[in-house]
């Protein structure tokens, strides 16, 4: 979830002891409103809780009830804690529903909530997200994008990650929706597709991205089809309910629909309901595959994957000020971490090795265990 993701990232940065600012993108681009909303959601004042309970009793989903409760709560001027009641906060907080309906705003609020809960000294700042919406599935080509009356500037046709993935799975068709064919393979991009991608991805990143595509090193969620089928075959309602994000209702739904579940993406479509969103189902199925039952409240270590030579001083500062163990070699981890830390690291290594194994099965390359991978130094 956005809440767990944000808490994990923020607790890691806070534990390093050298981070003084957290910058993230959001649709609103205004930190004051995001901080104000975060404060209410963390403190949960009595008036807000009563409003939330009332809207939930009317049958609204939790996100909808939360939006309505916050909208009503901020109709009272006394409930503003910020200093800009007549400035930035007022117009933005009058659009609570719009703010809470956009994914990057939601994640930004969760970052602010995590900072508050940790009593962190890190200061949050935000920049306005440019380009198409987070869930947009089309990638307009350069010429058509620049002439479109719906696009106001050159940055309006920056594609979303969802759209880029859709384009890769439908090569040569930058305007098609994501394929519904569960067996649709990821093919190497043709010239037209590659040109569209190159206009949407920074040059250095595009080089790495295209190299991976050309060599077949690109996985989709349906790469997990067989593994998911195996995992679900050996579960029952009680055991499924023990996995993170799997409620008893979802567990029963999985068992009842098991004969209809084919691929990963098709299973998500079959299982989702009004209350159980697509992203919730995706997370739940991944947790079943990866055998994840609980989320840590904080990340108890930091693992260095790589660094630039000119930034080596920063690494020295982290080693000096970090409040959590810093791991550069997996072989040293067992002696540096407690039981919880070793469990989390074990889950991380397993996930990485599974991904590596799937790539090897697809491309035929030699398997490289996570512990054998070298630190990247640029």
Task: Tell what function each PLM region has.
Residues 1-378:
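Active-site cores that bind ATP or allylic diphosphates and position pyrophosphate for catalysis
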């Amino acid at each position: 979830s956005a809440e767990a993701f944000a808490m994990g990232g923020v607790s890691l940065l806070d534990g390093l002891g050298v981070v003084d600012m957290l910058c993230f993108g959001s649709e609103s681009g205004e930190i004051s409103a995001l901080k104000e909303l975060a404060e209410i959601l963390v403190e949960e004042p009595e008036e807000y809780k009563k409003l939330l309970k009332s809207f939930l009793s009317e049958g609204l989903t939790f996100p909808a009830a939360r939006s309505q409760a916050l909208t009503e709560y901020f109709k009272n001027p006394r409930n503003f804690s910020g200093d800009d009641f007549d400035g930035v906060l007022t117009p933005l907080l009058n659009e609570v529903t719009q703010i809470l309906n956009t994914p990057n705003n939601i994640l930004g609020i969760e970052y602010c909530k995590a900072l508050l809960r940790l009593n962190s000294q890190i200061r949050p700042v935000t920049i306005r997200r440019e380009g198409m919406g987070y869930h947009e599935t089309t990638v307009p080509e350069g010429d058509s994008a620049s002439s479109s009356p719906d696009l106001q500037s050159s940055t309006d046709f920056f594609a979303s990650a969802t759209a880029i993935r859709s384009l890769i799975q439908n090569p040569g068709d930058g305007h098609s929706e994501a394929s519904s064919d569960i067996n649709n393979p990821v093919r190497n991009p043709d010239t037209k597709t590659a040109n569209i991608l190159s206009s949407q991805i920074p040059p250095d990143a595009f080089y790495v991205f295209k190299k991976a595509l050309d060599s077949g090193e690109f996985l989709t969620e349906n790469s997990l089809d067989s593994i998911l089928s195996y995992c679900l075959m050996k579960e029952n309602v009680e055991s499924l309910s023990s996995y993170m994000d799997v409620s008893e209702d979802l567990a029963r739904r999985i068992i009842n629909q098991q004969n209809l579940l084919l691929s990963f993406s098709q299973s998500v479509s079959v299982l989702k309901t009004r209350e159980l969103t697509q992203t919730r189902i995706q997370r739940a199925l991944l947790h079943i595959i990866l055998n994840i039952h609980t989320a840590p409240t904080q990340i108890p270590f930091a693992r260095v994957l790589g660094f630039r030579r000119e930034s080596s001083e920063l690494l020295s500062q982290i080693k000096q000020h970090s409040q959590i163990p810093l791991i550069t070699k997996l072989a040293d981890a067992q002696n540096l971490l407690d039981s919880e830390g070793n469990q989390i690291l074990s889950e991380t290594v397993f996930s990485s090795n599974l991904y590596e194994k799937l790539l090897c099965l697809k491309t035929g390359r030699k398997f490289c265990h996570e512990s054998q991978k070298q630190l990247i130094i640029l």
